[in-house]
Design a protein with these regions (language model features):
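Catalytic beta-strand/loop cores that center a nucleophilic Ser/Cys/Thr
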Residues: 25-29, 48, 116-186
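Alpha-helical scaffolding within the catalytic cores
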Residues: 36-41, 69-72, 173-178
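Short catalytic/ligand-binding loop motif for oxyanion handling, primarily in non-cytosolic enzymes
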Residues: 11-13, 40-41, 61-62, 86, ...
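Short hydrophobic segments within beta-strands
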Residues: 4-6, 87, 192
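Extracellular ligand-binding/catalytic regions of CAZymes and related secreted enzymes
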Residues: 184-218
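Aromatic-Pro/Gly-enriched surface loop or interdomain linker
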Residues: 1-51
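Structural motif
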Residues: 51-55, 189-191
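A glycine-rich, often tryptophan-bearing local segment used as a flexible ligand/cofactor-contacting loop or short
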Residues: 62-137
Length: 218
């Protein structure tokens, strides 16, 4: 079973749109929750979870930051080498937990970061997202795509060794937009960062790449 927890992401409902655009054979394996942390907090989902997908930034969208029940379940999942797909800014899903801040590979840094790291930024511009020359297995499957003007999440903190799978250029500088890393317990983390507005998360190639990442991680 895939568990997919999302917020409304400032009323864009990006996570919900991504879920709805999954191929039917994947969608039927997903339990999706938007703006509802009850199951995440209750914790029993962890025993059934084959893949954890997040489109969530803790403490935003009028939701509380997930608490101790969620923390225990997420850590148990990670400790049994669970894989994760972190969409958009979800490296900050649980940014108040110190151990979480250290395991996501790259990290969207919130204002007033507990570690004192300078906040990440999101300039708005059209962008071309390009697959890297990398021997990671996913790079042989991913495809390039172009997005209209949208927030581009950049200036992330690197918290562990990563393979960069996709990048985009902003003002002459190249930034990661998809990365692979591993938790201390051996689970793989794919950060897939592009996509905010509805017209961007409805992009066919973006959705195809997300579906490829899901299949790879299962």
């Amino acid at each position: 079973m895939i568990f997919f927890f999302s917020d409304n992401h400032y009323n864009t409902h990006a996570g919900k749109n991504i879920f709805q655009n999954l191929p039917c054979d994947l969608k039927e394996k997903v339990r999706f929750f938007e703006d509802d942390l009850t199951v995440l907090e209750e914790g029993s989902w962890e025993k059934e979870c084959d893949l954890l997908i997040l489109h969530l930034i803790g403490g935003t969208c009028s939701l509380p930051h997930p608490g101790s029940g969620a923390e225990g379940a997420v850590k148990r999942y990670c400790e049994r080498k669970g894989n994760m797909l972190l969409l958009h800014g979800s490296s900050a899903a649980f940014w108040q937990w110190q151990w979480w801040r250290e395991i996501t590979g790259v990290r969207w840094v919130r204002p007033n970061d507990p570690d004192g790291v300078e906040r990440s930024t999101h300039p708005k511009a059209p962008c071309h997202v390009e697959v890297c020359k990398c021997r990671h297995p996913l790079c042989g499957e991913l495809e390039n795509f172009d997005l209209p003007e949208d927030e581009i999440y950049i200036d992330l903190e690197q918290t562990s060794p990563v393979s960069c799978l996709m990048t985009c250029d902003v003002n002459g500088k190249t930034y990661p937009q998809c990365t692979s890393s591993f938790t201390p317990w051996g689970g793989e983390v794919i950060n897939f960062i592009p996509g905010h507005k509805e017209e961007c998360v409805s992009n066919a190639a973006l959705n195809a790449d997300i579906a490829r990442a899901v299949r790879y991680l299962l």
